[in-house]
From Swiss-Prot:
Substrate binds at N9, W10, K11, G171, S210, G231, G232. This is Triosephosphate isomerase. Involved in the gluconeogenesis. Catalyzes stereospecifically the conversion of dihydroxyacetone phosphate (DHAP) to D-glyceraldehyde-3-phosphate (G3P). Its EC number is 5.3.1.1. It is an enzyme of class 5 (isomerase). Keywords: Cytoplasm, Gluconeogenesis, Glycolysis, Isomerase. It comes from Hyphomonas neptunium (strain ATCC 15444). The gene is tpiA. It catalyses: D-glyceraldehyde 3-phosphate = dihydroxyacetone phosphate. Homodimer.
Length: 249
């Protein structure tokens, strides 16, 4: 079974003062931990300082997006190599908010993931359906297409992470049922095995829809759930650590 990954996504939140939360998490995650792997994906302005705060601990730091190109005339964008240089070892690509706000297509997401792999950092590739797509019975069709087109050619199964984020459950307080999560995660696992063979069983699949300390134990017990991509509950160390401890049991 893949090692559990508990990943936080701060989104567009956090100033330098909020790095105290990073320090609190780092203090509770030993470098020698064999339990769940722990990651905080921070705004670009906090990655370097966050990496310094977590040094010597088991807490890893990541970015929230990257550009598909390695450098050039792309004002305001960040290359994956820049994130790595600042201390990131992971990067989220294809989050539904990026897809909606910035028009990032599956092809763009694949290019971003490829750029991350070239830079030596792990892409967390997000997939998920909208409420309209779920109500129309299109969930598995949407997931199958996103999986086929968002994972770059040449990627190795163990070098990527998949995050299933039902768009209708992000930041809404609504959470997919255990049955709904199991159906999609099992489908994703089958798609990974179809693409990568037995190596597809090594790819971690995270759930990313309003996970919090109150529901984490139930979600983490679902088949083929290898961790969480956590939004609001990652902003406070106490909440994030509560989920980490549940995963580490």
């Amino acid at each position: 079974m893949p090692r559990t990954l508990i990943a936080g996504n701060w989104k567009m939140n956090g100033l330098m003062a909020n790095l105290a939360e990073v320090e609190r998490v780092a203090a509770e995650v030993p470098a020698s931990s064999e339990g769940a792997e722990t990651l905080l994906c921070l705004p670009a302005t906090l990655i370097h300082a966050g990496s310094a705060k977590s040094e010597g601990s088991g807490l890893k730091i990541g970015g929230e997006t990257c550009h598909a190109n390695e450098k050039g005339a792309h004002t305001g964008d960040l290359a994956a190599e820049m994130l790595k240089d600042a201390g990131a070892s992971y990067v989220i690509v294809g989050h539904s908010e990026r897809r909606a706000d910035h028009g990032e297509t599956d092809a763009v997401v694949a290019a971003q993931a490829s750029a991350a792999l070239r830079a030596g950092i792990t892409p967390i590739i997000c997939v998920g359906e909208t409420l309209d797509q779920r109500d129309a019975g299109e969930v598995l069709t949407v997931i199958t297409t996103q999986m086929a087109e968002s994972i770059p050619e040449g990627a190795e199964a163990a070098a990527i992470v998949i995050a299933y984020e039902p768009v209708w459950a992000i930041g809404t307080g609504r959470v997919a049922t255990s049955e709904q999560i199991a159906e999609v995660h099992t489908s994703i696992r089958n798609l990974l095995v179809r693409r990568f063979g037995d190596a597809g069983r090594t790819t971690r699949i995270l759930y990313g829809g309003s996970m919090n300390p109150g529901n984490a134990a139930e979600i983490l017990a679902v088949a083929e759930v290898n961790g969480g991509l956590i939004g609001g509950a990652s902003l406070k160390a106490a909440d994030f650590l509560a989920i980490y401890r549940l995963a580490a049991q």
